A protein has these predicted regions:
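Conserved catalytic cores of very large enzyme subunits
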Residues: 2-259
Length: 259
């Protein structure tokens, strides 16, 4: 005889597979979560267990089997320069190559959301591959790439960085983001008063009014915490070292703590 727990699990799975609002990909994702959360929760110290049960801390619903990290920050520049033996890809020769390589690698970056959380410092990554393209030719490619990200990896946790320097790629990304007004990818502009020209900062401010992005990060402050250019802004309030990451994320419930 099935137990009440087994019956409840089957009912949740049945609701997922028969949902009229979930896509097949979303159904697969939520079914996998049900299987993962059917496993025992990892062992915790008594105080941590109590804090979790009382709602003082939140595990962000990362699942009972943390087999994948929350934040991974690949060295995308190295990948574009050298390619990947594992993926049988050569390094990029031009902007089309670079964009194609990134779209492939993004599907192999592990994360809790099953989508890449960090997309890279895109203007710095892509600018070396522009070669002889005009601004219009760059804009067309970036807009196509931006739309691809939203349609195939539709997750607002997905985060890209630009700045502090100005470049045709930087401007193209700002134009595409303002025009398309997509939820994803999320975007942070890294500002440095010694590097960022005033007219670029003004353009960033106009974009914020137009599409509520990008967020602005203080470059010099982060340079002191990490090394210059050796980090990524991976969410609205998290920065981590490049070629590193973070295994998990725990939030404090300040209201519960105060009570």
């Amino acid at each position: 005889m099935p137990t009440s727990h087994e019956n409840a699990l089957q009912q949740r799975c049945q609701q997922i597979v028969t949902s009229p609002v979930l896509s097949p990909e979303q159904k697969r994702h939520f079914l996998a979560l049900e299987a993962e959360n059917n496993l025992p929760y990892p062992q915790l110290p008594a105080e941590a267990r109590r804090a979790l049960d009382e709602g003082v801390i939140c595990d962000m619903f990362e699942g009972h089997a943390p087999y994948k990290p929350r934040y991974v920050l690949p060295d995308y520049a190295r990948f574009l320069a050298n390619g990947s033996e594992w993926l049988e890809l050569e390094g990029a020769k031009d902007l089309d190559d670079a964009l194609s390589l990134l779209t492939i690698l993004y599907h192999h970056v592990p994360s809790v959301t099953s989508m890449p959380v960090y997309l890279g410092q895109l203007d710095a990554l892509l600018q070396p591959y522009v070669r002889i393209l005009t601004q219009d030719e760059i804009d067309i490619r970036i807009k196509r790439f931006w739309r691809y990200l939203d349609r195939t990896l539709p997750d607002a946790f997905m985060h890209a960085n630009i700045g502090p320097s100005d470049s045709p790629i930087t401007r193209a990304i700002l134009r595409a983001d303002a025009e398309l007004k997509q939820v994803s990818p999320n975007l942070t502009f890294i500002y440095d008063p010694e590097i960022t020209p005033d007219d670029l900062l003004l353009e960033v401010a106009k974009n914020i009014c137009e599409c509520s992005k990008p967020h602005i990060a203080n470059g010099p402050v982060h340079d002191k915490i990490f090394t210059k250019g050796g980090y990524g802004i991976v969410s609205c309030y998290n920065s981590l070292p490049l070629a590193g990451g973070g295994s998990t994320l725990v939030r404090l419930n300040l209201k519960a703590i105060a009570e």
